[in-house]
Amino acid sequence: MEELNFKEEELKGFKEFNKGGYEGKILLYKPEILLKRFESFIMPFLNMDNKKYKLIEFSKMNQLENIIALPKQLVNIDNTFSGFTMKKYNAVTIDNLKDLNKNIDLFAKLFKNLDYLHNKDIIIGDVKNKNILVDNNNNPIFVDVDSMGINKFPQDHIDRGPAGSVRRIPNINKKFKSLDYKSLDKLLLLSLFVEKLADNKEPMVNKIYNSSLSKEAKEIMHEYIYSDKFNYNIDLAAVFENERTR
């Protein structure tokens, strides 16, 4: 993979695209390319040489370019690996979609793509609204690649923060204790869908039961939110596919 070299001073000329997560900032390197730069304080916790190798391995999996913003180039700042460049997409986050049928179609695609990614031994460890963009054809695009585990390499870190406001989405942390990452990611997607159904003006259960979801889907959503006996063996991808095609 091509490498770019910058001096720390040169970064001041780049516009800040957004503040990114706790681990770094995202800078606008070119109109279509972003630069993900890691903060120095997390360096002791990450094996950066390992991350560099992981990104090289990941760049070979170019089949997923329409789904994921792949790392394009490694970036060295003051002769130290400090980030990578990635493609900038003209898209909106899933929060911008209000139509229920479009949401069902989107989440059906998300579940299908998540299966595909997992079959490539890739784990999406940061499934949340701001990391999922939607293009003009209602196709999902995952944009957070820096936390992924690839093949024999583990994730660099695991976000152990709260799943979100209990008032808007279920507190799903307690449901994660005995699940593998694939199940966890599917539940995170289900949480996002439940959150999309909810609003602050109406109880979540009313919002679900007043929607045009099928009876089966409504019962699954209700059980997921309110029951500790949720059936984790449910084929959630099939549920969304049935909703999309019925």
Regions found by a protein language model. Give the residues of each.
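ATP-binding glycine-rich loop module of kinase domains
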Residues: 13-70, 74
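Conserved alphaE helix
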Residues: 102-116
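Conserved N-terminal boundary motif of the eukaryotic protein kinase catalytic domain
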Residues: 2-17
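A conserved short helix/loop substructure at the end of the activation segment
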Residues: 224-239
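Conserved structural core of kinase catalytic domains
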Residues: 66-106
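Regulatory extensions appended to serine/threonine kinase catalytic cores
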Residues: 238-246
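Catalytic-loop of the protein kinase fold
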Residues: 114-135
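C-lobe/activation-segment region of protein kinase-like
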Residues: 141, 145-228
